[in-house]
Amino acid sequence: MLKTSEKIFSETPSIITKEEGLKILNGVIPLTTCLDKAFQERNRYFENKVRIHILDNIKNGYCPEDCGYCAQRKNANSGVQEYPMKSEQEIYEDAVQAKKNGAYRFCMVTSGTGPNRLTTEKLASTIQRITDELNMKVCLSAGLLDIEKAQVLKEAGLDRYNHNLNTSENHYSEICDTHTYLQRAQTLDSVSKAGIGMCSGVIVGMGESFQDIVDVAFQLKSFRVISIPVNFFIPVKGHTIKNPSVLTPELCVRILCMFRLINPDSEIRIAAGREGHLRSLSATALFAANSLFSSGYLNVKGSEILETVAMIRDAGFVPELSNGEILPENFGTESFYSEKNFPELYKFKKF
């Protein structure tokens, strides 16, 4: 059965001030000190557990919005494969596979400004089936949402609703001009009033300042967001971000530490860009973050599940399942040590 004790709202005050957040990002505070303080809070609320989330892109393209970072935006000419929303059965089968792969939560993502009434009802039906038949937590990302639609999704059993702020209010007009920061904030307000856990995070590396990163971290805190995905900008074909920032692995870890210390009891998730920006520090980042995505992102490939699980275990952490249990130690071992991956192990195999 699903755990019922998971919090909907963040309840713990920030550990640091805005000024201290800037010192972390500017490198004034040693990285080891940042990691030590971040790990203390991470361990306090999440112990040594890591939640693996798997995305299902249930509708790709056909989007009227003009978010500069997105390969699905209007007029992007990015070459992504466009397709309408998957059927309930297709999404359900994807959820079954995600559960087999050890996902803590199944994340459904659809392109577009926001769902209409009929789409909301279809999504609600799918969510209810997944939660009832698979006992699996579900997160939905479907754009702008009002309170009425949020309540329909809540009644269907939706666990989390994702709607990222992406950047600070001051910087928002630099990345999108078809909707406003206020509209995104209003969606979070609707989700909150419906009693759904808020999942809202950022995309770092879109030309923002360190002050912008600190400001949005505290804005998320003010909303009491319980789940914060931290994306590192990937320059996909067709993007319109004018001055992408240079992100080093160390800076990415510092950003995750800062988010942990501002939002101590929130789930801090390493999201898109992990493989390319954190690189050899991916495992180190888990001392600040307690969650990550596996098996790819919306239109970009990512580490597969066996590689992700191995990294988590190698760093001394354990993957957590929706029911609170731990992924078995022998998960994927047989296929991981296959002849394809390690041919030298089979060199002297007798027939």
Curated annotation (Swiss-Prot):
Keywords, comma-separated and alphabetical: 2Fe-2S, 4Fe-4S, Biotin biosynthesis, Iron, Iron-sulfur, Metal-binding, S-adenosyl-L-methionine, Transferase
Cofactor note: Binds 1 [4Fe-4S] cluster. The cluster is coordinated with 3 cysteines and an exchangeable S-adenosyl-L-methionine.
Keyword S-adenosyl-L-methionine: yes
Classification via CDD domains: Radical_SAM
Any Pfam family: Radical_SAM
EC number: 2.8.1.6
One MF term in the entry's GO annotations: iron ion binding
Residues annotated as binding [2Fe-2S] cluster: 107, 139, 199, 269
Pathway listed: Cofactor biosynthesis; biotin biosynthesis; biotin from 7,8-diaminononanoate: step 2/2
Binding site for [4Fe-4S] cluster: 63, 67, 70
Domain (Radical SAM core) ranges: 48-265
Alphabetical list of Gene3D superfamilies matching this protein: Aldolase class I
Catalytic function, reaction form: (4R,5S)-dethiobiotin + (sulfur carrier)-SH + 2 reduced [2Fe-2S]-[ferredoxin] + 2 S-adenosyl-L-methionine = (sulfur carrier)-H + biotin + 2 5'-deoxyadenosine + 2 L-methionine + 2 oxidized [2Fe-2S]-[ferredoxin]
Gene Ontology terms: biological process: biotin biosynthetic process
Top-rank taxon, per record: Bacteria
InterPro entries registered for this protein in UniProt: Aldolase_TIM, BATS_dom, Biotin_synth/BioAB, Biotin_synthase, Elp3/MiaA/NifB-like_rSAM, rSAM
Keyword Lyase: no
SMART domains assigned: BATS, Elp3
Cofactors (names): [4Fe-4S] cluster; [2Fe-2S] cluster
Entry's family note: Belongs to the radical SAM superfamily. Biotin synthase family.
Subunit (UniProt): Homodimer.
Function per UniProt: Catalyzes the conversion of dethiobiotin (DTB) to biotin by the insertion of a sulfur atom into dethiobiotin via a radical-based mechanism.
Protein name, UniProt field: Biotin synthase
Gene (name only): bioB
